[in-house]
């Protein structure tokens, strides 16, 4: 089956649509129009229709979309129709926040192992997860058939952690460390740098002020 070439922005919006549809379903809404989705998530109705068109034909002209059906389809497209076990490297403040974030479980993502090389953290628990030394990562990955890893360690340790994850068969990495990682082409890598996001905001604020002044 040929892989779809879909813009990343479309995938991001699809995730937002999926959450919106879940809220509609919880509120007992049966059908929804592209205009209502657009208003609910802050895009145009044309954008909603264009995004969905990448994946097929949905809904009925003049009627709209069945909420449960579209919710099912978007979840399936995003791969959320199956559980996703995850390993997390880093038991510091960020690691703790990630472990206690309920949104992961709500979307089918479950952290099954937390690892740190800090002897003061090893053996302690975050919620119901014991912090393991890095040497136990292969065991946990194999046991739970893990394909995704999260890196929440200092920049100086991130590449070594990424190498260990790749060596043990992980196929995708979400990296919170503020450093460029080198991984093989077959490994999916997504970087999340909170400082960069803040700098984008400060840039736009400065531009807005200069235009106003």
Curated annotation (Swiss-Prot):
Gene Ontology molecular function: any one: DNA-binding transcription factor activity
GO biological process terms, semicolon-separated: negative regulation of DNA-templated transcription; response to redox state
Location within or outside the cell: Cytoplasm
UniProt keywords, alphabetically: Cytoplasm, DNA-binding, NAD, Repressor, Transcription, Transcription regulation
Chain sites annotated for binding NAD(+): 90-95
Function field: Modulates transcription in response to changes in cellular NADH/NAD(+) redox state.
NCBIfam families: PRK05472.1-3, PRK05472.2-1, PRK05472.2-2, PRK05472.2-3, PRK05472.2-4, PRK05472.2-5
Subunit and partners: Homodimer.
Protein name, UniProt field: Redox-sensing transcriptional repressor Rex
């Amino acid at each position: 089956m040929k892989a779809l070439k879909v813009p990343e922005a479309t995938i991001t919006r699809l995730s937002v649509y999926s959450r919106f549809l879940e809220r509609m379903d919880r509120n007992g809404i049966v059908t929804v129009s592209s205009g209502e989705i657009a208003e609910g998530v802050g895009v145009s109705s044309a954008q909603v229709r264009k995004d969905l068109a990448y994946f097929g034909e949905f809904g009925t002209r003049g009627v709209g979309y069945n909420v449960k059906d579209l919710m099912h389809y978007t979840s399936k497209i995003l791969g959320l129709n199956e559980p996703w076990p995850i390993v997390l490297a880093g038991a510091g403040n960020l690691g703790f926040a990630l472990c206690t974030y309920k949104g992961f479980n709500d979307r089918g993502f479950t952290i099954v192992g937390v690892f740190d090389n800090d002897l003061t953290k090893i053996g302690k628990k975050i919620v119901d997860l014991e912090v393991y030394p890095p040497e136990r990562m292969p065991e946990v990955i194999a046991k739970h058939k893990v394909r995704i890893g999260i890196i929440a360690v200092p920049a100086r340790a991130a590449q070594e952690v990424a190498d260990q994850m790749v060596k043990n068969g992980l196929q995708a990495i979400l990296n919170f460390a503020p450093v460029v990682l080198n991984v093989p082409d077959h490994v999916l890598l997504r970087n999340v740098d909170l400082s960069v996001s803040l700098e984008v905001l400060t840039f736009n604020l400065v531009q807005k002020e200069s235009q106003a002044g």
